[in-house]
A protein has these predicted regions:
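N-terminal glycine-rich phosphate-binding loop for ADP-containing cofactors
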Residues: 1-319
């Protein structure tokens, strides 16, 4: 009946918004008042907003981790959605475990860090009550939810999470094993990372980025955003963390190791903070003109500068 979400970034606000939209009591915590203000704005004004009805945001109570973490004792499900960093997640769970009430369930929204690494050395009381609930972005639009148990996760916890997420939140729950990047990201991130590398070769050969996005979208059964637009939605910072996670966990000889680092020009974007929609600019950005209209610009990886984005017709493609 109630959900505490810890982490007010893209995924945390998405999860909190979905729960609020379905009329559940929600607590959303982040590291600072400034972060909470950004989370509030993201819930109402994000692209897309986390709630369809702005009034539903009234179901959310906001607070900071330092001041309000003890409030989790009042909530049935505690969902961690902080940065994709193992030490950060472990430190949070160490603080969280003594505060939650008996009978509550816990989950981590990690997109690929094995649960066994997160819970190593933690109390058995936590290990039996925790699972991975891997939502996909944007949370309210993506039906897929991966649910992953640890070695000691109670069947009752798995059943409770599966029932709530499937019936109350309307997700299609896929049960996966506790392996690196699980199922969706093990396939999808390999596609995206290899795509960035091969697309960079095409860009260097003079192929427009819009043509690459047009081809690597609906014709391949993929989102209409295309490759670059999809990564703008996910965030280059997330892609970089996924690559680092793969570097640690993939076995020697795995083909994925050839593509885990971002191509040079794209890594420079990451260093500048040009990481995607949540930063206001990634491969694409929206510019407001003097007459109030908007135009889409694309960051040309060949020239290293912004230019107007051109609509590419697939009929114009050449072999």
């Amino acid at each position: 009946k109630s959900v505490a979400v810890i982490g007010g970034g893209t995924m945390g606000t998405g999860i909190a918004g979905l729960c609020a939209q379905t009329d559940h009591k929600v607590l959303l915590l982040d590291v600072s008042e400034e972060a909470i203000q950004k989370a509030k704005d993201r819930i109402i004004n994000g692209r897309p907003p986390a709630v369809d009805d702005p009034k539903k945001a009234g179901n959310i109570t906001f607070g900071t981790i330092d001041n309000d973490l003890a409030l989790v004792a009042n909530y049935d499900w505690i969902c961690e959605a902080v940065v994709e960093d193992l030490p950060t997640k472990r430190a949070l769970f160490e603080k969280l475990e003594p505060l939650r009430r008996k009978g509550s369930v816990i989950s981590t929204n990690t997109s690929g860090i094995p649960l066994r690494d997160i819970t190593e050395g933690m109390p058995d009381s936590l290990k039996k009550d925790i699972a991975v609930t891997h939502f996909f972005n944007p949370v309210k639009a993506m039906r897929l939810l991966e649910l992953i148990p640890g070695e000691q996760t109670s069947p009752d916890v798995m059943n409770a999470l599966s029932a709530f997420i499937g019936t109350q939140l309307g997700k299609g729950v896929v049960h996966a094993k506790d392996t690196v990047n699980f199922i969706g990201n093990r396939i999808g991130c390999f596609w995206m990372m290899t795509g960035l590398h091969y697309a960079q070769e095409a860009v260097d050969d003079g192929i427009p980025m819009e043509q690459i996005d047009a081809l690597m979208s609906s014709p391949m059964g993929l989102p209409p955003t295309g490759l670059y637009g999809l990564i703008d939605l996910i965030g280059l910072d997330v892609m970089d963390l996924v690559g680092k996670n793969l570097a640690i966990n993939l076995p020697a000889g795995d083909k994925g190791l050839d593509f885990i680092a971002l191509p040079g020009p794209i890594h420079k974007m990451l260093e500048r903070g040009q990481i995607g929609r949540k930063a206001g600019a990634g491969f694409y950005r929206m510019q407001k003109l003097d007459d109030g209209s908007r135009k889409t610009e694309i960051f040309d990886l060949l020239d290293g500068d912004w230019r107007a984005s051109e609509k590419f017709q697939l009929d114009d493609a050449h072999a």
